[in-house]
Amino acid sequence: MEDAVYQEFLELEQEHWWFRGRRTIFVSLLDRHFGRDPGGKRLLMDLGCGVGGMLEQLGEYGQVIGTDVTLKGLEHCAARDFERLVACNGPAGCFGDESLDCISAFDALEHIPDDVGTLREIHRMLKPGGLLIASGPAYQFLYAQQDRIVHHVRRYTLGDFAAKARSVGFEIEKATYINFILFPLILPIVLLLKIVQKISKPDDTKAGSNVGIGIPRIVNETLAGVFGGEAKLLRAFSAPAGHSLVMVARKPGPTR
């Protein structure tokens, strides 16, 4: 990501509706598929931890290590007193075989050219019975300036996302689109912005992310409630469409 976006995310992630909503969904999925164990011995890795937006929550499930390809994000994590941090250019060689109980990749795989190779490395590092929880942006036809600013290589369909995980040996426990309630509102806005940007040709290096657009507090709170409220609905079904997606997958074998 551009350096300015790291700073922007640091300032927004605690209060902005998008960050809050997705955290609620991710925590709900981890509660159901992994279970809390604060202070326990289970070892988790957050791949592409950025400025540490999920490290505190992941600490409720065991000992968490944050990894990122850039020092900029890890510097922000260290400033927030997160201590277990590793700089590595992708997961290859970062950890030994079958050494981790859970790996999270929240909006990380879409940044990596060889996402299947990364999934293969994740599978290698997980213990038998270990869990992968991964999220990403949905639908390539929505690829726009925002994706370029944060250095996305691609966007996914849910079928493609899950198929890539299966191809390296994972069993899928849950795969769903998220941000599906607001998607009918988001979709025309994104498509309109794509048209405007195609005409105006803005400079990506000087633009901030679209999450930095200021909105009234009451609107932010409402949107956070709507997005986060999807967590309860997703206990009963998987959404057929949405602006993002999330997958919970397990490496076959008895949990150690």
Segments and roles (model prediction):
Residues 116-131:
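A short glycine-rich, Lys/Arg-flanked "PGG" loop and its adjoining helix->strand segment in the class I
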Residues 170-180:
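Conserved S-adenosyl-L-methionine
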Residues 111:
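A short His-aromatic
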Residues 10-11, 132-154, 158-166:
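Short, glycine-/aromatic-enriched active-site segment of Class I SAM-dependent methyltransferases
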Residues 96-101, 114, 128, 170:
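Active-site acidic short loop of glycosyltransferases
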Residues 1-98, 102-106, 117-119, 217, ...:
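Conserved N-terminal segment of class I S-adenosyl-L-methionine
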Residues 82-84, 150-153, 190-193:
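Short, hinge-like loop/turn segments at secondary-structure boundaries
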